[in-house]
């Protein structure tokens, strides 16, 4: 499994251990969705809503390009599937 996919799964696991409250604000869900399935421009535009510093935006683009290059479509679908299961889990 690729490093970026592992990070997404670790983030998801932390949600489950964080006291059982998996309510995630829609903005975070949108960020994660764009990070995994959006274009680099869409993701950078989303990041710019929170922090429009050039260095932050450049790092966001580099990270998104890296994820797109390293993760397969199947990896991304698997990560989204895990997140969907967490969002709908009765443990949350």
UniProtKB/Swiss-Prot annotation:
Residues 1-22 form the signal peptide. It comes from the Eukaryota. It is found in: Secreted. SMART domains: UTG. Saliva and sebaceous glands. Keywords: Allergen, Disulfide bond, Secreted, Signal. Belongs to the secretoglobin family. Heterotetramer composed of two non-covalently linked disulfide-linked heterodimer of chains 1 and 2. This is Major allergen I polypeptide chain 1. The lineage of its organism: Eukaryota, Metazoa, Chordata, Craniata, Vertebrata. The gene is CH1.
